[in-house]
Protein backbone atom coordinates (compact mmCIF):
# COMPACT_ATOMS: atom_id res chain seq x y z
CA UNK A 1 0.00 0.00 0.00
CA UNK A 2 1.47 3.33 -1.09
CA UNK A 3 0.84 6.64 0.64
CA UNK A 4 -1.75 8.60 -1.32
CA UNK A 5 -3.27 12.09 -1.19
CA UNK A 6 -5.89 11.78 -3.94
CA UNK A 7 -8.69 9.77 -2.39
CA UNK A 8 -12.26 10.15 -3.68
CA UNK A 9 -15.51 9.71 -1.79
CA UNK A 10 -16.40 6.77 -4.02
CA UNK A 11 -13.15 4.96 -3.19
CA UNK A 12 -13.66 5.49 0.53
CA UNK A 13 -17.25 4.26 0.41
CA UNK A 14 -16.05 1.18 -1.43
CA UNK A 15 -13.65 0.45 1.42
CA UNK A 16 -16.35 1.08 4.03
CA UNK A 17 -18.66 -1.40 2.32
CA UNK A 18 -16.16 -4.27 2.11
CA UNK A 19 -17.01 -7.47 3.99
CA UNK A 20 -16.01 -6.87 7.59
CA UNK A 21 -13.38 -9.62 7.84
CA UNK A 22 -11.82 -8.68 4.51
CA UNK A 23 -11.56 -5.05 5.57
CA UNK A 24 -9.87 -5.88 8.87
CA UNK A 25 -7.49 -8.28 7.13
CA UNK A 26 -6.44 -5.61 4.64
CA UNK A 27 -6.10 -2.97 7.35
CA UNK A 28 -3.90 -5.25 9.47
CA UNK A 29 -1.69 -6.00 6.47
CA UNK A 30 -1.23 -2.27 5.85
CA UNK A 31 -0.58 -1.70 9.54
CA UNK A 32 2.20 -4.29 9.68
CA UNK A 33 3.81 -2.83 6.58
CA UNK A 34 4.33 0.53 8.28
CA UNK A 35 4.22 -0.06 12.05
CA UNK A 36 5.61 -2.51 14.63
CA UNK A 37 3.11 -5.24 15.40
CA UNK A 38 1.64 -5.48 18.89
CA UNK A 39 2.77 -2.02 19.97
CA UNK A 40 0.54 0.82 21.11
CA UNK A 41 1.65 4.38 21.84
CA UNK A 42 0.30 5.75 25.11
CA UNK A 43 -0.60 9.39 25.82
CA UNK A 44 -2.10 11.24 28.78
CA UNK A 45 -4.34 14.29 28.41
CA UNK A 46 -4.71 17.07 30.99
CA UNK A 47 -7.25 19.88 30.91
CA UNK A 48 -5.14 22.93 31.76
CA UNK A 49 -8.06 25.34 31.39
CA UNK A 50 -11.59 24.04 31.76
CA UNK A 51 -15.02 25.38 30.80
CA UNK A 52 -16.44 28.78 29.77
CA UNK A 53 -15.48 28.28 26.13
CA UNK A 54 -17.22 30.85 23.88
CA UNK A 55 -17.69 28.41 21.00
CA UNK A 56 -20.88 26.48 20.27
CA UNK A 57 -19.60 22.98 19.43
CA UNK A 58 -22.74 20.93 20.05
CA UNK A 59 -20.85 17.94 21.45
CA UNK A 60 -18.83 19.83 24.03
CA UNK A 61 -19.76 20.22 27.73
CA UNK A 62 -17.15 22.97 28.08
CA UNK A 63 -19.14 25.44 25.99
CA UNK A 64 -20.45 28.38 28.02
CA UNK A 65 -23.64 28.18 25.96
CA UNK A 66 -24.84 24.91 27.49
CA UNK A 67 -26.01 24.02 31.00
CA UNK A 68 -23.71 21.17 32.01
CA UNK A 69 -22.03 20.19 35.26
CA UNK A 70 -18.63 21.38 34.08
CA UNK A 71 -17.30 24.19 36.27
CA UNK A 72 -15.03 26.77 34.74
CA UNK A 73 -11.43 26.95 35.90
CA UNK A 74 -8.64 29.37 35.16
CA UNK A 75 -5.46 28.37 33.38
CA UNK A 76 -3.65 25.91 35.61
CA UNK A 77 -0.39 26.91 37.28
CA UNK A 78 2.75 25.67 35.53
CA UNK A 79 3.86 23.74 38.61
CA UNK A 80 0.62 21.77 38.77
CA UNK A 81 0.86 20.91 35.09
CA UNK A 82 4.40 19.63 35.53
CA UNK A 83 3.35 17.60 38.56
CA UNK A 84 0.62 15.92 36.50
CA UNK A 85 3.10 15.28 33.69
CA UNK A 86 5.50 13.56 36.07
CA UNK A 87 2.71 11.31 37.34
CA UNK A 88 1.74 10.48 33.78
CA UNK A 89 5.31 9.55 32.96
CA UNK A 90 5.50 7.38 36.08
CA UNK A 91 2.42 5.51 34.88
CA UNK A 92 3.93 4.79 31.46
CA UNK A 93 2.77 7.59 29.17
CA UNK A 94 5.19 8.67 26.46
CA UNK A 95 3.33 11.79 25.40
CA UNK A 96 1.68 14.46 27.55
CA UNK A 97 -1.14 16.42 25.96
CA UNK A 98 -2.45 19.69 27.37
CA UNK A 99 -5.88 21.01 26.41
CA UNK A 100 -7.44 24.43 27.01
CA UNK A 101 -11.08 25.40 26.42
CA UNK A 102 -10.38 28.44 24.28
CA UNK A 103 -11.39 29.67 20.85
CA UNK A 104 -7.77 30.77 20.60
CA UNK A 105 -5.01 31.49 23.15
CA UNK A 106 -4.47 35.03 24.39
CA UNK A 107 -1.05 36.60 24.00
CA UNK A 108 -0.79 37.03 27.79
CA UNK A 109 -0.97 33.25 28.17
CA UNK A 110 1.76 32.38 25.67
CA UNK A 111 4.71 32.66 28.15
CA UNK A 112 2.97 30.28 30.55
CA UNK A 113 2.22 27.82 27.75
CA UNK A 114 5.81 27.83 26.55
CA UNK A 115 7.03 27.25 30.13
CA UNK A 116 4.74 24.21 30.36
CA UNK A 117 6.12 22.82 27.11
CA UNK A 118 9.73 23.27 28.18
CA UNK A 119 9.10 21.69 31.58
CA UNK A 120 7.39 18.62 30.16
CA UNK A 121 10.08 18.21 27.49
CA UNK A 122 12.73 18.24 30.23
CA UNK A 123 11.11 15.09 31.64
CA UNK A 124 11.76 13.20 28.41
CA UNK A 125 8.12 13.21 27.31
CA UNK A 126 6.72 14.21 23.96
CA UNK A 127 4.43 17.22 24.15
CA UNK A 128 1.09 18.01 22.55
CA UNK A 129 -1.31 20.91 22.98
CA UNK A 130 -4.83 21.74 21.85
CA UNK A 131 -5.63 25.41 22.39
CA UNK A 132 -8.01 26.30 19.58
CA UNK A 133 -7.10 28.37 16.55
CA UNK A 134 -3.54 29.68 16.18
CA UNK A 135 -1.99 32.57 14.33
CA UNK A 136 1.21 31.87 12.39
CA UNK A 137 3.20 33.72 15.07
CA UNK A 138 1.66 31.71 17.91
CA UNK A 139 2.45 28.48 16.09
CA UNK A 140 6.07 29.60 15.76
CA UNK A 141 6.26 30.43 19.47
CA UNK A 142 4.97 26.99 20.46
CA UNK A 143 7.32 25.28 18.04
CA UNK A 144 10.29 27.28 19.35
CA UNK A 145 9.46 26.13 22.88
CA UNK A 146 9.70 22.53 21.68
CA UNK A 147 6.07 21.51 21.16
CA UNK A 148 6.03 18.26 19.22
CA UNK A 149 2.35 17.92 18.27
CA UNK A 150 -0.60 20.27 17.94
CA UNK A 151 -4.12 18.86 18.02
CA UNK A 152 -6.83 20.54 15.98
CA UNK A 153 -9.62 18.23 14.85
CA UNK A 154 -11.69 18.71 11.72
CA UNK A 155 -14.55 16.99 13.61
CA UNK A 156 -16.64 15.95 10.59
CA UNK A 157 -17.08 16.50 6.85
CA UNK A 158 -17.20 20.02 5.39
CA UNK A 159 -20.81 19.39 4.36
CA UNK A 160 -22.02 18.44 7.86
CA UNK A 161 -19.81 20.82 9.80
CA UNK A 162 -22.34 23.67 9.96
CA UNK A 163 -24.78 21.42 11.81
CA UNK A 164 -22.29 21.07 14.66
CA UNK A 165 -20.34 24.34 14.90
CA UNK A 166 -21.03 27.90 13.75
CA UNK A 167 -18.45 29.94 15.68
CA UNK A 168 -15.51 28.99 13.48
CA UNK A 169 -15.40 27.83 9.89
CA UNK A 170 -13.99 24.67 8.39
CA UNK A 171 -11.43 26.83 6.62
CA UNK A 172 -10.39 28.28 9.99
CA UNK A 173 -9.49 24.77 11.08
CA UNK A 174 -7.58 24.02 7.89
CA UNK A 175 -5.72 27.32 8.22
CA UNK A 176 -4.61 26.45 11.76
CA UNK A 177 -3.34 23.08 10.54
CA UNK A 178 -1.35 24.90 7.85
CA UNK A 179 0.16 27.27 10.43
CA UNK A 180 1.14 24.30 12.59
CA UNK A 181 2.77 22.47 9.69
CA UNK A 182 4.57 25.60 8.47
CA UNK A 183 6.01 26.10 11.97
CA UNK A 184 7.54 22.62 11.85
CA UNK A 185 5.27 20.82 14.31
CA UNK A 186 3.53 17.50 13.85
CA UNK A 187 -0.23 17.44 13.41
CA UNK A 188 -2.81 15.55 15.43
CA UNK A 189 -6.18 15.82 13.69
CA UNK A 190 -9.21 13.58 13.44
CA UNK A 191 -12.90 13.68 14.12
CA UNK A 192 -15.93 12.56 16.10
CA UNK A 193 -18.30 9.76 15.14
CA UNK A 194 -21.90 9.67 16.33
CA UNK A 195 -23.06 13.28 15.94
CA UNK A 196 -25.86 12.37 13.54
CA UNK A 197 -23.64 12.41 10.47
CA UNK A 198 -24.19 10.09 7.52
CA UNK A 199 -21.84 7.45 6.15
CA UNK A 200 -20.99 9.93 3.39
CA UNK A 201 -19.98 12.47 6.03
CA UNK A 202 -17.71 9.95 7.71
CA UNK A 203 -16.13 9.23 4.35
CA UNK A 204 -15.81 12.97 3.73
CA UNK A 205 -13.94 13.49 7.00
CA UNK A 206 -11.39 10.84 6.07
CA UNK A 207 -11.02 12.27 2.56
CA UNK A 208 -10.21 15.70 4.02
CA UNK A 209 -7.60 14.25 6.38
CA UNK A 210 -6.01 11.87 3.89
CA UNK A 211 -5.82 14.48 1.12
CA UNK A 212 -3.91 17.01 3.20
CA UNK A 213 -0.46 17.71 1.67
CA UNK A 214 1.05 15.62 4.47
CA UNK A 215 -1.00 13.14 6.47
CA UNK A 216 -1.46 14.00 10.15
CA UNK A 217 1.09 12.13 12.20
CA UNK A 218 -1.71 11.25 14.61
CA UNK A 219 -5.39 10.69 13.73
CA UNK A 220 -7.70 10.48 16.77
CA UNK A 221 -11.03 8.82 16.04
CA UNK A 222 -13.48 9.81 18.78
CA UNK A 223 -16.80 8.17 19.53
CA UNK A 224 -19.24 10.78 20.80
CA UNK A 225 -19.61 10.84 24.58
CA UNK A 226 -23.12 12.13 25.14
CA UNK A 227 -23.22 14.67 27.95
CA UNK A 228 -26.39 15.93 29.60
CA UNK A 229 -27.03 19.55 28.77
CA UNK A 230 -25.40 19.52 25.34
CA UNK A 231 -27.49 19.53 22.14
CA UNK A 232 -26.22 16.04 21.29
CA UNK A 233 -27.15 14.38 24.58
CA UNK A 234 -29.82 12.29 22.82
CA UNK A 235 -27.83 11.45 19.69
CA UNK A 236 -28.26 7.94 18.31
CA UNK A 237 -25.74 5.34 19.43
CA UNK A 238 -22.92 4.45 17.05
CA UNK A 239 -23.00 0.89 15.74
CA UNK A 240 -19.78 -0.72 17.02
CA UNK A 241 -19.08 -2.42 13.70
CA UNK A 242 -19.40 0.91 11.88
CA UNK A 243 -16.87 2.46 14.26
CA UNK A 244 -14.42 -0.41 13.81
CA UNK A 245 -14.82 -0.17 10.04
CA UNK A 246 -13.90 3.50 10.20
CA UNK A 247 -10.74 2.70 12.15
CA UNK A 248 -9.78 0.18 9.46
CA UNK A 249 -10.47 2.59 6.61
CA UNK A 250 -8.44 5.32 8.34
CA UNK A 251 -5.54 2.88 8.67
CA UNK A 252 -5.67 1.98 4.98
CA UNK A 253 -5.97 5.59 3.82
CA UNK A 254 -3.26 6.99 6.13
CA UNK A 255 -0.86 4.07 6.51
CA UNK A 256 1.98 5.94 8.22
CA UNK A 257 -0.19 7.81 10.74
CA UNK A 258 -0.87 6.73 14.29
CA UNK A 259 -4.59 5.99 14.55
CA UNK A 260 -5.72 6.77 18.07
CA UNK A 261 -8.66 5.45 20.05
CA UNK A 262 -9.67 8.59 21.88
CA UNK A 263 -12.89 9.83 23.51
CA UNK A 264 -15.56 7.18 23.96
CA UNK A 265 -13.17 4.35 24.76
CA UNK A 266 -14.64 4.16 28.27
CA UNK A 267 -17.84 2.97 26.62
CA UNK A 268 -16.13 0.21 24.62
CA UNK A 269 -15.72 -3.24 26.11
CA UNK A 270 -12.60 -5.33 25.65
CA UNK A 271 -13.88 -7.10 22.57
CA UNK A 272 -14.63 -3.87 20.73
CA UNK A 273 -11.27 -2.35 21.65
CA UNK A 274 -9.52 -5.52 20.52
CA UNK A 275 -11.13 -5.35 17.09
CA UNK A 276 -10.12 -1.69 16.87
CA UNK A 277 -6.51 -2.71 17.48
CA UNK A 278 -6.89 -5.43 14.85
CA UNK A 279 -8.24 -2.77 12.49
CA UNK A 280 -5.07 -0.71 12.91
CA UNK A 281 -5.51 1.50 15.96
CA UNK A 282 -2.09 1.86 17.58
CA UNK A 283 -2.42 4.73 20.03
CA UNK A 284 -4.59 5.45 23.06
CA UNK A 285 -5.10 7.96 25.81
CA UNK A 286 -4.25 6.23 29.06
CA UNK A 287 -6.10 6.28 32.36
CA UNK A 288 -8.40 8.69 34.19
CA UNK A 289 -10.27 11.17 31.96
CA UNK A 290 -10.17 12.96 28.64
CA UNK A 291 -10.73 16.63 29.48
CA UNK A 292 -14.24 16.30 30.96
CA UNK A 293 -15.30 12.76 30.01
CA UNK A 294 -14.23 9.38 31.42
CA UNK A 295 -11.44 7.20 30.09
CA UNK A 296 -10.63 3.60 31.10
CA UNK A 297 -8.40 3.24 34.13
CA UNK A 298 -4.74 2.49 33.52
CA UNK A 299 -5.13 -0.86 35.33
CA UNK A 300 -7.83 -1.97 32.88
CA UNK A 301 -5.69 -0.86 29.95
CA UNK A 302 -2.69 -2.86 31.13
CA UNK A 303 -4.85 -5.91 31.82
CA UNK A 304 -6.18 -5.78 28.27
CA UNK A 305 -2.69 -5.26 26.83
CA UNK A 306 -1.48 -8.31 28.75
CA UNK A 307 -4.35 -10.43 27.43
CA UNK A 308 -3.57 -9.39 23.86
CA UNK A 309 0.22 -9.48 24.07
CA UNK A 310 0.40 -5.75 23.34
CA UNK A 311 3.32 -3.74 24.62
CA UNK A 312 2.99 0.00 25.20
CA UNK A 313 5.86 2.04 23.82
CA UNK A 314 8.16 3.24 26.55
CA UNK A 315 9.23 6.72 27.56
CA UNK A 316 12.68 7.88 26.46
CA UNK A 317 13.85 8.04 30.07
CA UNK A 318 13.31 5.36 32.69
CA UNK A 319 10.17 6.16 34.71
CA UNK A 320 10.59 6.93 38.38
CA UNK A 321 9.02 4.61 40.92
CA UNK A 322 5.26 4.96 40.84
CA UNK A 323 4.05 6.48 44.10
CA UNK A 324 0.49 7.43 43.16
CA UNK A 325 -2.31 5.92 41.14
CA UNK A 326 -4.18 9.18 40.78
CA UNK A 327 -3.50 11.08 37.55
CA UNK A 328 -4.97 14.36 36.41
CA UNK A 329 -6.55 15.29 39.74
CA UNK A 330 -7.72 18.64 38.36
CA UNK A 331 -9.87 17.24 35.59
CA UNK A 332 -13.59 17.74 36.08
CA UNK A 333 -15.46 14.69 37.39
CA UNK A 334 -17.46 12.63 34.95
CA UNK A 335 -20.58 14.27 33.57
CA UNK A 336 -21.33 11.69 30.90
CA UNK A 337 -23.87 8.90 31.21
CA UNK A 338 -22.19 5.57 30.57
CA UNK A 339 -24.06 3.04 28.41
CA UNK A 340 -24.22 -0.51 29.68
CA UNK A 341 -21.91 -3.12 28.29
CA UNK A 342 -24.73 -5.02 26.64
CA UNK A 343 -25.66 -1.99 24.58
CA UNK A 344 -22.24 -1.82 22.96
CA UNK A 345 -21.10 -5.21 21.80
CA UNK A 346 -21.38 -8.91 22.36
CA UNK A 347 -19.89 -10.45 25.49
CA UNK A 348 -17.29 -13.00 24.45
CA UNK A 349 -17.37 -14.58 27.89
CA UNK A 350 -20.92 -15.89 27.38
UniProtKB/Swiss-Prot annotation:
<dbReference type="InterPro" id="IPR002684">
    <property type="entry name" value="Biotin_synth/BioAB"/>
</dbReference>
<feature type="binding site">
    <location>
        <position position="128"/>
    </location>
    <ligand>
        <name>[2Fe-2S] cluster</name>
    </ligand>
</feature>
<keyword id="KW-0408">Iron</keyword>
<dbReference type="GO" id="GO:0051537">
    <property type="term" value="F:2 iron, 2 sulfur cluster binding"/>
</dbReference>
<feature type="binding site">
    <location>
        <position position="57"/>
    </location>
    <ligand>
        <name>[4Fe-4S] cluster</name>
    </ligand>
</feature>
<dbReference type="Pfam" id="PF04055">
    <property type="entry name" value="Radical_SAM"/>
</dbReference>
<keyword id="KW-0949">S-adenosyl-L-methionine</keyword>
<dbReference type="GO" id="GO:0051539">
    <property type="term" value="F:4 iron, 4 sulfur cluster binding"/>
</dbReference>
<comment type="function">
    <text>Catalyzes the conversion of dethiobiotin (DTB) to biotin by the insertion of a sulfur atom into dethiobiotin via a radical-based mechanism.</text>
</comment>
<dbReference type="GO" id="GO:0004076">
    <property type="term" value="F:biotin synthase activity"/>
</dbReference>
<dbReference type="GO" id="GO:0009102">
    <property type="term" value="P:biotin biosynthetic process"/>
</dbReference>
<keyword id="KW-0093">Biotin biosynthesis</keyword>
<dbReference type="InterPro" id="IPR013785">
    <property type="entry name" value="Aldolase_TIM"/>
</dbReference>
<feature type="binding site">
    <location>
        <position position="188"/>
    </location>
    <ligand>
        <name>[2Fe-2S] cluster</name>
    </ligand>
</feature>
<dbReference type="InterPro" id="IPR024177">
    <property type="entry name" value="Biotin_synthase"/>
</dbReference>
<comment type="pathway">
    <text>Cofactor biosynthesis; biotin biosynthesis; biotin from 7,8-diaminononanoate: step 2/2.</text>
</comment>
<protein>
    <recommendedName>
        <fullName>Biotin synthase</fullName>
        <ecNumber>2.8.1.6</ecNumber>
    </recommendedName>
</protein>
<comment type="similarity">
    <text>Belongs to the radical SAM superfamily. Biotin synthase family.</text>
</comment>
<dbReference type="GO" id="GO:0005506">
    <property type="term" value="F:iron ion binding"/>
</dbReference>
<feature type="binding site">
    <location>
        <position position="97"/>
    </location>
    <ligand>
        <name>[2Fe-2S] cluster</name>
    </ligand>
</feature>
<keyword id="KW-0411">Iron-sulfur</keyword>
<feature type="domain" description="Radical SAM core">
    <location>
        <begin position="38"/>
        <end position="256"/>
    </location>
</feature>
<feature type="binding site">
    <location>
        <position position="60"/>
    </location>
    <ligand>
        <name>[4Fe-4S] cluster</name>
    </ligand>
</feature>
<feature type="binding site">
    <location>
        <position position="260"/>
    </location>
    <ligand>
        <name>[2Fe-2S] cluster</name>
    </ligand>
</feature>
<keyword id="KW-0808">Transferase</keyword>
<keyword id="KW-0004">4Fe-4S</keyword>
<feature type="binding site">
    <location>
        <position position="53"/>
    </location>
    <ligand>
        <name>[4Fe-4S] cluster</name>
    </ligand>
</feature>
<comment type="subunit">
    <text>Homodimer.</text>
</comment>
<keyword id="KW-0479">Metal-binding</keyword>
<dbReference type="InterPro" id="IPR006638">
    <property type="entry name" value="Elp3/MiaA/NifB-like_rSAM"/>
</dbReference>
<dbReference type="InterPro" id="IPR010722">
    <property type="entry name" value="BATS_dom"/>
</dbReference>
<keyword id="KW-0001">2Fe-2S</keyword>
<dbReference type="Pfam" id="PF06968">
    <property type="entry name" value="BATS"/>
</dbReference>
<dbReference type="InterPro" id="IPR007197">
    <property type="entry name" value="rSAM"/>
</dbReference>
Amino acid sequence: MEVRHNWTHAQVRELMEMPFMDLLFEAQQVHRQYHPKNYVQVSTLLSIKTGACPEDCKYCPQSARYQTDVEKERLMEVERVLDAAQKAKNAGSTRFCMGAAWKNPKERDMPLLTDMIKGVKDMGLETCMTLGMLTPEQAKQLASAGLDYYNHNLDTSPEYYGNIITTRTYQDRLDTLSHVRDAGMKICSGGIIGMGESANDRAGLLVELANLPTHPESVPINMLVKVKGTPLETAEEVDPFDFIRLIAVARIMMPTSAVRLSAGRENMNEQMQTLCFMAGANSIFYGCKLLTTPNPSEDKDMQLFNKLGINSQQVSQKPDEITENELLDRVVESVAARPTKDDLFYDASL
